[in-house]
Design a protein with these regions (language model features):
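Gly/Thr-rich phosphate-binding loop signature of adenosyl cofactor/nucleotide-binding cores
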Residues: 1-82
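Charged, amphipathic alpha-helical linker segments immediately N-terminal to NTP-binding catalytic cores
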Residues: 85-88, 94-129
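Structured core elements
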Residues: 56, 144-146, 153-155, 175-177, ...
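P-loop NTPase nucleotide-binding/switch module
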Residues: 129-149
């Protein structure tokens, strides 16, 4: 499932201090992976093994390198970098993009997005958000409780008392997470996170005795 840059901006612009520098239509570009990288040696001309399908981040080091070049060499490096089909380029610390980058990106339909965050801080924040977006997930029929900080999922055929078991735990001071339909997401490291759906919320369905 792809995520457009427009949706990213709508959801995280305030939190991550994001601003679109290119024309609005470039924000329809789609991010299809949670991988975020810096272009590295591509700026110096080595394009072999460049993973252009990933979101790219330009920090102070990359921009300082481009500024160290002659205007012509800097322009060539930018054009070479943007000749690939890149989903989005982030520029950290609110730094100014190199001369000609925004114009070239507009021509190529590549969004350039500025963030006020420092590079390391931004990497962590955007990576966490994208991992959550692209994490594999499924819906399971069952009841989920939080028991001393650990999720306990009760599964089985209808009518065997899953909800009743969780209710018994709730009466003992534990917490109901979801009943009937549990949305389970697998994060990095094999961690499973369960939550309820927006319709049922923290309500429970229980048969009358």
């Amino acid at each position: 499932m792809a995520l457009t840059v427009a949706k990213l901006l709508a959801r995280k612009a305030d939190v991550l201090g994001l601003a679109l520098l290119t024309r609005e239509s470039t924000a329809e570009s789609e991010i299809s992976t949670d991988e975020v990288v810096s272009p590295g040696l591509v700026l110096a001309g080595f394009t072999e093994r460049f993973t252009s399908s990933r979101s790219q981040v330009l920090g102070e080091t990359e921009l300082a390198y481009l500024r160290s070049l002659s205007p012509e060499a800097s322009r060539e490096a930018v054009q070479r970098f943007l000749s690939f089909d890149i989903p989005v380029v982030f520029i950290t610390k609110g730094l100014e993009p190199p001369a000609g980058m925004v114009e070239t990106a507009d021509e190529r339909g590549i969004p350039i997005v500025s963030t006020r965050l420092k590079t390391g801080e931004f990497y962590g924040a955007i990576k966490a958000f994208l991992e959550a977006q692209f994490a594999p997930s499924t819906f399971l029929h069952g009841s989920l409780a939080d028991v001393y900080g650990v999720g306990l999922l009760f599964m089985g055929r209808s009518g065997i008392g899953k909800s009743e078991c969780v209710l018994d735990l709730v009466e003992r001071g534990h917490r109901l997470v979801a009943d009937d339909q549990v949305h389970v997401t697998r994060r990095s490291g094999g961690i499973l996170i369960g939550r309820g759906n927006s319709v049922l919320g923290f309500h429970m369905e229980r048969r009358a005795s």
